[in-house]
Amino acid sequence: MAANARFNWEDPLLLDQQLTDEERMVRDSAQKFAADKLAPRVLEAFRHEQTDPAIFREMGETGLLGATIPVEYGGSGLNYVCYGLIAREVERIDSGYRSMMSVQSSLVMVPINEFGTEAQKQKYLPKLASGEWIGCFGLTEPNHGSDPGSMITRAKKVEGGYRLNGSKMWITNSPIADVFVVWAKDDAGDIRGFVLEEGWA
């Protein structure tokens, strides 16, 4: 009679044996950062209802922000498995900081990398990847949630650019953000993304 297979509750999908050496190294680095740098500060942050922007700079120094962004723009140039492993290790400690990290790395940096001009990539991505700047993603609206088709925020073409008019809510990172990727409909009703900076009005 064959022996029963043994269930590994710490790795039920046997993920570890499927990872490359680089992916394991990234996971271990993220795990160490989360345990050593993030965990000791999370309880104090909860107690005092504060977010520590310095954690973003430390994430950037460790290479955890913009993991999939090309190296020439300050990212780590890693694959999405590595990005998922980073997110998983941060999530183990704190869902809030993982959400903030994901907004920065995915919802802010990826649109700039995929659709931004070369000048925008050069200007924004390195500072976002380093954590020097914090970004947010403005889609959700008070009356329509996150349904882009129903959004009422408008972008009106004016001399020198666009004027945005509308309201957004529940925007992760917005209280401490330096860069904003905001979505609005133009005069033709097409949905467009705009990169804004703190202080622009």
What are these regions (language model features)?
Residues 27, 50-54, 75-83:
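A structural motif shared across PLP-dependent enzymes of the aminotransferase-like
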Residues 17-38:
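Mature N-terminal segment immediately following signal peptide/propeptide cleavage
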